[in-house]
Amino acid sequence: MVEKEEAGGGGGGGISEEEAAQYDRQIRLWGLEAQKRLRASRVLIVGMKGLGAEIAKNLILAGVKGLTMLDHEQVSPEDPGAQFLIQTGSVGRNRAEASLERAQNLNPMVDVKVDTEDVEKKPESFFTKFDAVCLTCCSRDVIIKVDQICHRNSIKFFTGDVFGYHGYTFANLGEHEFVEEKTKVAKVSQGVEDGPEAKRAKLDSSETTMVKKKVLFCPVKEALEVDWSGEKAKAALKRTAPDYFLLQVLLKFRTDKGRDPTSESYKEDAELLLQIRNDVFDSLGISPDLLPDDFVRYCFSEMAPVCAVVGGILAQEIVKALSQRDPPHNNFFFFDGMKGSGIVECLGPQ
């Protein structure tokens, strides 16, 4: 159903004729009010590797008001393999600065900025300038710290990463309200449902109604520290995606080594991953069999196709949260590139 609303050019939060033409497709898809909310939103993306570039591209094209790309690291020789915003010959430059020109060219109406400081050194006041914060390439401690800051200040929080064939996203939207478009169902008179086809009630796809809903999210710390000792948790263990436990292993590797597994040190890193898997699973009180040894073959480096999928999902969730349109993923999304499928998992306090 296309909402028949006029794009006002003056005050009252309207958008200009130029913006209405630029975002005509989005307005037809999710409505003028949702687009207005996007045009009033500022987003921070931390980590401008392959996944960060995909998220930035999608949000800039969607038409947020402003987007800040924060990264204190330099471009490595491997980065251009998945990071398409970086131009040739940029090795050694700051990753965010090297991404600015192509990012801004995607949509001149969006205010794209860069920040070259380390996110760990940013004060709480820095994050309050944004409506949504999305972390990539960050340590577990930084993820938890920034999530707590966002939670205190009612800022939409997202995080995600890509490890080889695997990727994940997580959202903490606090107490989130949204509207969902539902198709109206015509009332059926008693006995009519068994009558001739012509007399049966039909679903009119052009007749819809907007339903307001509310959902509550938990902090990332609680989602990562599930107690698997309870009977209810044990029953859910077999149904939980193995990628949740893979994430625990990879975040521990990142904390211990200060980097992600690399193909240059495959043998050493593979052995360390197996050891970390055993240690993490032992601390959780669960069997290592939940994550077979061959997982080490599929979690090295960023793969461009996986970045595209996970970045598309993560950007879509940010758009949904900012526009308050459609149900969000609560709270994890895991993508397995070997299977070519993804799953949404709600993990946290039982």
Curated annotation (Swiss-Prot):
GO molecular function, one term: SUMO activating enzyme activity
Signal peptide range in chain numbering: none
Entry annotated with the keyword Acetylation: yes
Subcellular location: Nucleus
A single Gene Ontology CC term: nucleoplasm
InterPro entries with a match to the protein in the record: ThiF/MoeB/HesA, ThiF_NAD_FAD-bd, Ubiquitin-activating_enz, UBQ/SUMO-activ_enz_E1-like
Entry-annotated residues carrying N-acetylvaline: V2
Residue positions, PTM N-acetylmethionine: M1
Disulphide bond pairs: none
Residues where Phosphoserine is found: S16
GO biological process, one term: positive regulation of protein sumoylation
N6-acetyllysine modification, residue list: K202
Tissue: Broadly expressed, with highest levels in testis.
Keywords: Acetylation, Ligase, Nucleus, Phosphoprotein, Ubl conjugation pathway
Pfam name, any one: ThiF
UniProt keyword annotation of RNA-binding present: no
UniProt pathway: Protein modification; protein sumoylation
SUPFAM superfamilies attached to this UniProt entry: Activating enzymes of the ubiquitin-like proteins
Family the UniProt entry places it in: Belongs to the ubiquitin-activating E1 family.
Known role: The heterodimer acts as an E1 ligase for SUMO1, SUMO2, SUMO3, and probably SUMO4. It mediates ATP-dependent activation of SUMO proteins followed by formation of a thioester bond between a SUMO protein and a conserved active site cysteine residue on UBA2/SAE2.
Quaternary assembly: Heterodimer of SAE1 and UBA2/SAE2. The heterodimer corresponds to the two domains that are encoded on a single polypeptide chain in ubiquitin-activating enzyme E1. Interacts with UBE2I.
Protein's name in the database: SUMO-activating enzyme subunit 1
Organism: Mus musculus (Mouse)
Gene coding for it: Sae1
